[in-house]
Amino acid sequence: MLYHYIKIAFRNLLKYKLQSFICIVGLAIGFTSFALSSLWIRYELTYDTFRKDADRIYYVRMESETDDQGLSSVTPYPLARYLKETFPEIEESCNTSAWKTDFLYNEKKYESFDMVMDSATEHMFEIELISGSRDFMIPKSNKIAITDKLAKEVFGTKDPLGEKLKIWSDDMEICAIVKSQDQHSNFPFGILKPSRQTEEWNVAYCQTFIKVR
């Protein structure tokens, strides 16, 4: 009986070739679109899931009441502290921002992600110190930390501590090596610096995160 049904199906496919071709192509496109959409959704939903307590960390966005720009990904620096002090449900809050930047070492040009952060970011994002000191967290200093991955790329087997990188027009001294976070993340970084602290609410330049209890 099954053989009979298969035989009839093939006969119909051969009899109505154009319609069969359109149906098969449409079905293939549908399955392919579904598979690609599923992969994309999975990719988007796995950002930073490797972090400890990832299900308790939230990205704060700001809605403007003065224009039609909608939600903004940047927030004022004082917002993180205000949220933690105002809402007891918030265990921790932090400010950070990252962008791709060029730097020079021995007149050779390199490229990496430069991330500025406050002290709370170090704990919330589990930034692991391999060697050196945490002087790179001192505001307005010329100290920076780089990842072990970037250190290997730029210096090879040479110890990078004490070496200087020219970032923009500033000579920044490497005082620490931190562990690279190569997992799927919104915040890839190679260089770490302290964020510029300000009490101005009318200037939005950083990204705020909160960790709920």
Model regions: which residues?
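N-terminal hydrophobic targeting signals that begin at the initiator methionine
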Residues: 1-3
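A short amphipathic helical element positioned immediately N-terminal to and/or at the very start
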Residues: 5-14
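Short, strongly hydrophobic transmembrane alpha-helices
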Residues: 15-43
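Membrane-proximal extracellular/periplasmic loop immediately following the first transmembrane helix
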Residues: 37-102, 204-212
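Short acidic/polar micro-motifs at solvent-exposed secondary-structure junctions
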Residues: 62-72, 95-120, 126-144, 182-184, ...
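Mid-to-C-terminal secondary-structure elements
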Residues: 118-131, 144-213
